[in-house]
């Protein structure tokens, strides 16, 4: 009986350690000692143009472009959204290549970079933008000193591919449910947590576009990472449901193996 009790206690201790350290265990299991090799280039189909040997450009309309990292294993897609007076870059990949060069080939408007969330494969890391705007959340605001925000390990997750923790210079705070004006093109900031606590989506109500980041895209969604929460996912889903119509086109930040822009209708 004593032996059984000791085994039960030992199992409880081990289980408690696993639960307490689950985020560290998950990161360790995801960490690679080498950068992932680039995928072979493919014909991306009608409407897609190879910018160089890494980026593809997909024209959604005259003022909206998807910039694909179609040789990166996560198949990231970032979005250039043009107004009359300024433009938004929504996500910037890992920074393995400088997306700014691609953006400069498409517009000379002033650029504001807006990350959908703070994971390493979306913030560009070493890529520098003139202006960076972040969602206005108390747990981010309180950590800012001299407009600088140092990301935390679980916000960034960059160690899985060897990226150091970056520091972002915050030029503008985006209040959830408010509208940012690009000049003849208003975008509504939707707070859509779930994938992370800081996830946002951008809604172009006039065009019927929702840029959803990692909250929603074709393929497997990640609601189990550090900083993820399934209850928050429900909240974010309700926000999108109440803000969008049935005709909205949803553009995500990743795709599965299918060609083209990751879009849901």
Question: What is each model feature region?
Answer:
Residues 96-181:
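Active-site HxH/HxHxD metal-binding segment of metal-dependent hydrolases
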């Amino acid at each position: 009986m004593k032996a059984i009790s000791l085994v039960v206690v030992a199992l409880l201790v081990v289980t408690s350690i696993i639960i307490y350290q689950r985020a560290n265990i998950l990161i360790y299991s995801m960490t690679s000692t080498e950068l992932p090799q680039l995928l072979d280039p493919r014909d991306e189909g009608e409407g897609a143009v190879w910018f160089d040997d890494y980026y593809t450009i997909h024209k959604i309309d005259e003022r909206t472009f998807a910039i694909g990292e179609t040789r990166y294993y996560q198949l990231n897609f970032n979005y250039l959204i043009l107004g009359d007076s300024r433009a938004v870059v929504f996500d910037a990949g890992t920074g393995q290549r400088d997306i700014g060069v691609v953006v400069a080939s498409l517009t000379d408007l002033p650029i504001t970079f807006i990350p959908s969330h703070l994971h390493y494969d979306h913030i560009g890391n070493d890529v520098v933008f003139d202006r960076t705007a972040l969602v206005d959340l108390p747990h981010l605001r309180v950590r800012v000193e001299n407009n600088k925000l140092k990301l935390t390990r679980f916000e960034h997750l960059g160690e899985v591919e060897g990226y150091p923790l970056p520091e972002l210079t915050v030029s503008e705070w985006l209040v959830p449910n408010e509208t940012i004006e690009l000049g003849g093109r208003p975008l509504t900031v939707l707070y859509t947590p779930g994938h992370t606590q800081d996830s946002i989506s951008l809604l172009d109500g006039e065009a019927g576009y929702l840029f959803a980041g990692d909250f929603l895209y074709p393929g497997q969604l990640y609601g189990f990472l550090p900083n993820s929460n399934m209850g928050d996912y429900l909240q974010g889903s309700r926000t999108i449901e109440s803000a969008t119509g049935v005709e909205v086109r949803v553009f995500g930040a990743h795709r599965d193996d299918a060609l083209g822009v990751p879009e849901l209708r």
